[in-house]
Every structure is written in C-alpha cells, then in structure tokens.
Amino acid sequence: NPHWVPELRPKTGQTPEVSTYVLSQDGVSETISNYSALLKKMSAGYLREGKKYITLAVGCTGGKHRSVAIAQELVNRVTKGKKLAGKSIVAQAVHRDLGREI
C-alpha cells in the first residue's frame, strides 16, 4: 500500500511513481488481465441487448493510490486499439474519492 511508503503517500495513483509501484505488486497484473477479460466477455452480451454503457467500480481503503492506478490501467488495456463488434471501445476512469482524504 503506497500509503505506508513516505515518498508515495502524498501522491496519487495518477502519478507514474505510484502507478508503477502499484502495478508491480504480486498478483496485480493477473487481476487486471482477468478483470479486463471478463469485461470484454460481458460487453458482447451488453451489445446484443442494445445496451451502450457498463459501469465498473474498483475500490481500495483510501481511494487515492491503488484503485486509481488499477482503474486507469484497466482503461488503458480495454481501449488500446480494441474494437468490439466493429466499434471502438470508449472508456473513462472517474476517481470519485480523490481529494476526499483526510
């Protein structure tokens, strides 16, 4: 948890230092790969049903470091040159809890 690393604590998961730290932890890459694969499978069904939006949530204790870095990496992996049913995938990360820390 970057919260316990003094030089990372004041930064967010949007900074390269925190993002690199979070994404290099054991199991994180596999978790993100599994999550993005699930999203791609779900998306096909959503399209068949005529739905245009999927909302995903990623959370952690403080909402400042881990969830921010992981959500942004999910956006990067899901949108990077990907198409679904011939349509480009558009994704965005909304970091609800950034700025709320005490």
Residue ranges and their predicted role:
Residues 50, 64, 86-88:
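Recognition helices and adjacent regulatory flanks at domain boundaries
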Residues 84-100:
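Short beta-strand-centered segment that lines the nucleotide-binding/catalytic pocket of NTP-utilizing
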Residues 52-75:
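Catalytic cysteine-centered active loop of the rhodanese-like fold, especially the PTP/DSP P-loop
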Residues 74, 78-82:
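Hydrophobic alpha-helical packing residues
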Residues 1-54, 79, 97-102:
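C-terminal accessory "lid"/substrate-recognition subdomains
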Residues 24, 71, 85-86:
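Serine/threonine-rich low-complexity intrinsically disordered regions
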